[in-house]
Amino acid sequence: MMDVDRSIRVAVDTGDVTLGSEKSIQSLKLGKGQLVIVAANTPKDIVEDVEYYTNLSDIPSYTYEGSSVELGSVCGKPFTVATLIVNDPGDSTILDDLR
């Protein structure tokens, strides 16, 4: 899990990442993004929306093993992050790591 944490942090720091459920779902509806990451404790209705739109847009999703608090911390944010979309991984190898 540490490698995933580091890859997420590098993507946040050097790439283009959209944080938050509403913005993530909006991006999925438009078919934007390369990878969706969902925290393990994300509410069921949000998970269902993410799964529905990832299936429509063929964007892969990954369930982060930690909570939204832990995912927020990994992103370097002082708030919870239930979902995020990696638009551009930057220097991160996250797309290769999770495939």
Swiss-Prot record:
Species annotation: Methanobrevibacter smithii (strain ATCC 35061 / DSM 861 / OCM 144 / PS)
GO biological process: translation
Record keyword Ribosomal protein present: yes
Family: Belongs to the eukaryotic ribosomal protein eL30 family.
InterPro entries, per the entry: Ribosomal_eL30 (IPR000231), Ribosomal_eL30-like (IPR039109), Ribosomal_eL30-like_sf (IPR029064), Ribosomal_eL30_CS (IPR022991), Ribosomal_eL8/eL30/eS12/Gad45 (IPR004038)
HAMAP family: Ribosomal_eL30
Superkingdom of the organism of origin: Archaea
Keyword Transport: no
A GO molecular-function annotation: RNA binding
Name of the protein in question: Large ribosomal subunit protein eL30
Keywords: Ribonucleoprotein, Ribosomal protein
Listed GO CC annotations: cytosolic large ribosomal subunit
Gene that encodes the chain: rpl30e
